[in-house]
C-alpha cells in the first residue's frame, strides 16, 4: 500500500505497486499492472507481483524479454525439446532482488517464485504466452 505523505518511497511504499489486477487463466498468486503498446514495434511493460510458492507452467514467449527483480527471489529452468519430450537445459537459474534476467524469444522455460516477488517485466512487441508440453 502506498504512502503519499512519505518523502522517500521504495518497493513497499510506492504507488507504482497499487492497483494490480488478477487476470483470468493465469497462475494462482499472480497480479499485474500494465499498459498495452500502441506501436506494433514497441515493447510491452508489466509490473508483476507473485506470491511465494507461485509457479508458472513450462512456456515460451514470442519475443525477447527482460525481468528485473525489484523485491524477492525467483528461479527459472530452461528446457529443450527431445525425442522424450521436454528435458532441462542447464542448471536452474536464481534471480534475487536487484538482478536482471533476459530470455530469448521462443526459449522454453518455467518460473518459480521462492519469495513474494515484485518484478518489472519487459517484452519485445506484444506479449504472448504459449504453454509447452
Question: Which residues fall in each region the model found?
Answer:
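Short beta-strand segments in beta-sandwich/barrel cores
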Residues: 55-57, 72-78, 100, 127
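Ligand-binding loop in jelly-roll beta-barrel domains
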Residues: 96-97, 102-130
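Short acidic-glycine-tyrosine-enriched beta hairpin
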Residues: 81-105
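A cytosolic small-molecule/anion-sensing beta-strand core signal
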Residues: 47, 70-71, 115
Amino acid at each position: 500500500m502506498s504512502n503519499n505523505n512519505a518523502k522517500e518511497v521504495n518497493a513497499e511504499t510506492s504507488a507504482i505497486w497499487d492497483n494490480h489486477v488478477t487476470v483470468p487463466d493465469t497462475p494462482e498468486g499472480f497480479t499485474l499492472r500494465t499498459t498495452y503498446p500502441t506501436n506494433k514495434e514497441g515493447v510491452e511493460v508489466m509490473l508483476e507481483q507473485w506470491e511465494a510458492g507461485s509457479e508458472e507452467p513450462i512456456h515460451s514467449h514470442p519475443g525477447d524479454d527482460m525481468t528485473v527483480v525489484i523485491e524477492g527471489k525467483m528461479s527459472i529452468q530452461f528446457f529443450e525439446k527431445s525425442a522424450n519430450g521436454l528435458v532441462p537445459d542447464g542448471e536452474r537459474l536464481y534471480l534475487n532482488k536487484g538482478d536482471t534476467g533476459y530470455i530469448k524469444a521462443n526459449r522454453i522455460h518455467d518460473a518459480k517464485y521462492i519469495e513474494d516477488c515484485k518484478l518489472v517485466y519487459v517484452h519485445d512487441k506484444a506479449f504472448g504466452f504459449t504453454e509447452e508440453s
